[in-house]
Amino acid sequence: MTRRFFYVLLLLLPLSLWAQPEDYTWDVAGSNSAESMPCGGGDIGMNVWTEDGDILMYVCRSGSFDENNTLLKAGRIRLHVGEPYVYNTASENTPSEKHTYSQTLHLSDGTMTLSCPTHSVTLWVDVWKPVIHVEVNATKAVHAQIFYESWRDYDHPVGRQEAQQCSYKWTAPKDLVTHADTIIRRDDFIEFYHQNPPATVFDYTVMQQGLLSEASHLYNPLKDLISGGRLRGMTSKALRHHHFQLTLANVQGSREEWRKTLDATERNVRLKADRLVTRQWWAAFWQRSWIRCDGEAAELSRNYTLFRYMLGCNAHSAWPTKFNGGLFTFDPRYVDSQSDFSPDYRRWGGGTHTAQNQRLVYWPLLVSGDYDLLQPQFDFYLRLLSTAETRSRVYWGHGGACFTEQIENFGLPNPAEYGSKRPDGFDPGLEYNAWLEYEWDTVLEFCQMILLSKTYGGMDISKYLPLVRSCLQFFDEHYRYLALQRGRKNLDEDGHLVIYPGSACETYKMAYNPSSTLAALRTVTETYMHEVDTIGMIGFLQRIPPIPHRIVDGKEMIAPAMAWERINNEESPQLYPVFPWRLYGLGRDNLEIARNTYLYDPDVVRFRSSKGWKQDNIWAACLGLTEEAARLTAEKLKSGPYRFPAFWGPGFDWSPDHNWGGTGMIGLQSMLLQEVDGEIIILPAWPKSWNVSFKLHASGGRTVEVEYRDGEVKKKIIQ
């Protein structure tokens, strides 16, 4: 038995070593938070850098929303150990000192180490408990001082521009403030928390949108929310080994309940065991999938891996990873010199979840096999299902869930985007907004992700099925309802729904049968029927209109819609039937039509870019346009403008731009692996000169492992 186990271990060892990512190291100290390195786990992120000889850490925990729906940082931690760190900013002139300082992110186990000749500091976050550990190890006894620093020690007025960080945005009242935190210093710990007052932006939004009679039934994550933590480990003694612990808690309740939660977490800390299970989790995370390139593409796969690490830091959260910075925003003046605000600032809000952007953070997780990372985004919509159904019932008197594009974490449209100066009699269910009116189909992408999580990973999705059904029901009932507002019939002469007014993304407005919406309805319905219920959705499927085509300069292509009133943004929804809906593309009879759309549609060509949330690299890969896909994906995944390579942006949003990273991930994956009706296509858009080894996930619970080198497939394992 022992010998057999030994041989099995030897067989598994090469795969294990190949899967583990390389460390990422700096040997020159940074000088500000924009030159920070991320570290995290569970639902906590830290930006770590050195400044004036001290180690500084911004700490952010997912779900720490204030009364205005700003996503607050827990604060800043400063660690001073003995003598200041030796700086290497002049290392080019003094090569003998080049390695006196190092800061290393150990991706394989999620830890970070900062080292100088006299001591090292190791940082790690428990992936199962909201606890940060700071460990100092020195060659001789040293004093180590740790400080908690806050910028919220007074009521801070929030002006109109700074209010972009919260749900009020440009409609912020003149007296808007971020209320002060409570900070308590004791001999052996520091305790700090932000407690939301009784009235929050939730109450304002409910009143604004005519739902006061329903308020007690609506989900409210801001009510009585207390977020903060407790820092322990301070000592005046000089020691060779110091250990500091920062425990965080977010509780909707009283201060006593919040403290009980902190106490319980602290009692459950088992340092050695917690360190072991955290390292095991990260090791298993990297075993799930990988992409390793060398040569000219090595930078792309490295940055793919670094960004995937950042996503992994929010794996066990109650809240999705925000597209506009996730857990790793830094001082805003380094993103925009005109935004000299607090570290809590990020453009496009903290509790506002823009669906078109959020989806791009989550699509790549199916192919990477990170199904647990998908769950916070799925749960986000599930929690809001009742609120979305309430909107349909109160405003229009029919069923189904109406989710809007700029959606708050309590399920209603963002109050600024909803419109504060609305005409009398305007439909209260609609956003009075030229970009967002009638755009409510993005939730269907998350519905498809839910269904594919079962297809790919065997996830139990039973609790999410009412959400999927209700989202489809909304389109069936609402567009028949609108048709009857216009005339006697609720379907067209072919028995199809009339999706009007519709919206093809934010771009083609007042659209008639937009192709992006029709592709979404058809794909989600067919996937639902295949995975769950073959019979019950047949009638609805038959009512979905066909995707419209048009002829431009003699070439047939997908139309954005049958008709539209105006173009309002710069998206290309006519390619959504290619991605995310995979109805057109390689291995299908309609490939030429899709390629014509990509290559010759004048708007698609005009809007093409690799910036931010732009998806052209993905479409090029899905259409087998290898040179184009490689060029655009290389532009996506090349190192960003900040010191840490996977801090992209700000793009159209903020830094680090997570939908920039998400589109890069999807594009790289799609160049390596695609499927058509369950048939796997290997290297569909991969340059012959790029060497790669990868393991990715496919439908049916399959994994695909390939080594491609010097223009040949050296290994292919599908299991």
How should each PLM-predicted stretch be described?
Residues 370, 494-495, 625-628:
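Loop/turn elements at helix/coil->beta-strand transitions in domains of secreted/extracellular proteins
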Residues 8, 141-142, 457-462:
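Secondary-structure transition into beta-strands, especially the periplasmic turns and strand N-termini
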Residues 323-352, 401-465, 476-539, 714:
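The feature captures the catalytic groove of carbohydrate-active enzymes
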Residues 353-366, 439-451, 516-526, 570-582, ...:
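Well-ordered alpha-helical segments within folded domains of soluble proteins
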Residues 4-15:
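Sec-dependent N-terminal signal peptides
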Residues 300-315, 443-452, 466-475:
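Extended, hydrophobic/aromatic-rich amphipathic alpha-helical segments that build helical scaffolds
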Residues 448-482, 539-565, 573, 584-704, ...:
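Non-catalytic carbohydrate-binding regions of carbohydrate-active enzymes
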Residues 20-420, 518, 534-605, 645, ...:
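Aromatic-residue-lined binding/catalytic grooves and analogous aromatic/hydrophobic interfacial grooves
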